[in-house]
Amino acid sequence: GKEGYPADSKGCKVTCFFTGVGYCDKECKLKKASSGYCAWPACYCYGLPDSASVWDSATNKCGKK
């Protein structure tokens, strides 16, 4: 698998700015990752499936129309 910042449907990082402990681990596991943590202010996942969308500065479309 791969690791990285999981991207939501808009291509944005999953924020953990105001979330509780364990939020990112749960979010990452929902995306079939093995684990995750809050790399403040965004979630970071380990063991993501290769098909998972991760945030990439080169292909960043967050906030763009």
UniProtKB/Swiss-Prot annotation:
Subcellular location as annotated: Secreted
InterPro entries in the record: LCN-type_CS_alpha_beta_dom, Scorpion_toxin-like, Scorpion_toxin-like_sf, Scorpion_toxinL, Scorpion_toxinL/defensin
Spans traversing the lipid bilayer: none
Keyword set, alphabetical order: Amidation, Disulfide bond, Ion channel impairing toxin, Neurotoxin, Secreted, Toxin, Voltage-gated sodium channel impairing toxin
GO CC annotation, single: extracellular region
Occurrences of domain LCN-type CS-alpha/beta (ranges): 2-63
Expression sites (tissue/organ): Expressed by the venom gland.
Residue(s) carrying Cysteine amide: C62
UniProt superkingdom: Eukaryota
Main localization of the protein described in the UniProt heading: secreted
Listed Pfam families: Toxin_3 (PF00537)
Gene Ontology terms: biological process: defense response
CDD domains reported for this sequence: neurotoxins_LC_scorpion
Disulfide bonds, paired cysteine numbers: C12-C62, C16-C38, C24-C43, C28-C45
Single Gene Ontology MF annotation: toxin activity
Domain commentary: Has the structural arrangement of an alpha-helix connected to antiparallel beta-sheets by disulfide bonds (CS-alpha/beta).
Family: Belongs to the long (4 C-C) scorpion toxin superfamily. Sodium channel inhibitor family. Alpha subfamily.
Function: Alpha toxins bind voltage-independently at site-3 of sodium channels (Nav) and inhibit the inactivation of the activated channels, thereby blocking neuronal transmission. This toxin is toxic to frogs but non-toxic to insect larvae (T.molitor), mammals (rats) and crustaceans (crabs) at the doses assayed.
Protein name per its UniProtKB record: Beta-toxin Tf4a
